[in-house]
Amino acid sequence: MKLHKLMLGTAAAALGASALLAPVASAQAAEQFFPSLVYRTGPYAPNGTPFANGYSDYLRLVNERGGINGVKIKVEECETGYSTARIVECYERLKGANGGATVFQPLSTGGTFALTEKAPVDKIPLITAGLGRSESADGGVFKWNFPLLGTYWVAADTLVQHVGKQAGGLAKLKGKNIALIYHDSAYGKEPIPLLQKRAEMHGFKLTLLPVAHPGVEQKATWLQVRRDRPDYVFLWGWGVMNSTAIKEAVATGYPRNKMYGVWWSGAEPDVKDVGANAKGYNALALQHGAEKDASVVKEVLAKLHDKGKGTGPREEVGDVLYMRGLISAMLATEGMRVAQAKYGKGKVITGEQMRWGLENMNLTDIGLRSLGFGGVMRTTSTNCSDHMGA
């Protein structure tokens, strides 16, 4: 984990019916259904939309490449507005559609908690890359959850170790005050147990400052920050909450170089309205940052956006949240590729087979480069017990 600074015919009628049967059957076969749970509307749309665009573009790119061993991806979006109830509604509507869902990626911790109870029954895996339930990294217990690349406990631990290093060692955190400004939801509460344990271990004070959805009202929170002057502020926000927090830090004179955001608090929408005042603010990177020069980005532009087949604005291709959607889609299709290697290349797989694929992934340097992700993310592999990947 790293930190970064934000910155079809008339001719056909002449053919015999038998000549038409084979191609029609072929066209109807070999489609793998990937439902896409998105939020392009509501207060979190500025962050949810680029992720959804990246996710869509990569699946389109896979089809432009010929699919996974010839199997094309069929996608259907369902708008959730970041509502857990609507995520469940979309899940129930799409799980049996188009031959059955292959995998779901809810992009919501609340949604992840709700679907975790359903996935084992319906035998459909959940990918929650960099989000969801931290304990679900244990594949021995959570057999259908895959919090690939990182969990919130990993993120919180990384932040504590980083500020400890900045202070001259973890022992130097004794007596210091770390404030957690968090989205008052399942998402925002995820790091608390880890941080409480670390506070007990190292003797620092942990101040918990919840912020109500959607996060535009933070005056009282930052008045407390101004009064207490914590040594560090950890920001666990999403959507407008992030930019609001940075603006309030400016207004109260809290140094941005003492602020550290989780990877969902470190993207372009979080700082663009703050401008130069965001200088010094730090955020975790979920392996990648903005990747405008990545091979996969250039391929997306050439094969999709240059031909009018892209999703969303061309200029966002390669931005942080767009890349996160792109990577999340890639993780799913590579899980599908691994499953095909066991259950039959060129065949449509089941959700249960997909689970096996996700549990046996090995993304090597060579493999990542061949997909266009060289230099974008590190190698990762999963197994029966490790569903996060190492």
Language-model features: where?
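C-terminal segment of classical bacterial N-terminal signal peptides
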Residues: 16-26
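Beta-alpha junction/loop-to-helix N-cap segments that form part of ligand/metal-binding clefts
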Residues: 31-33, 46-53, 65-139, 148, ...
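Extracytoplasmic "Venus flytrap"
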Residues: 32-56, 78-85, 107-108, 181-190, ...
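Signal peptide-proximal N-terminal region
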Residues: 53-75, 168-171, 200-203
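Extracellular/periplasmic Venus flytrap/periplasmic-binding protein
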Residues: 85-89, 96, 134-135, 143-253, ...
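Periplasmic-binding protein-like
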Residues: 94-107, 125-129, 177-182, 229-239, ...
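Extracellular/periplasmic periplasmic-binding protein-like sensory domains
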Residues: 249-326
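Segments of small-molecule ligand-sensing domains
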Residues: 309-322, 333-390
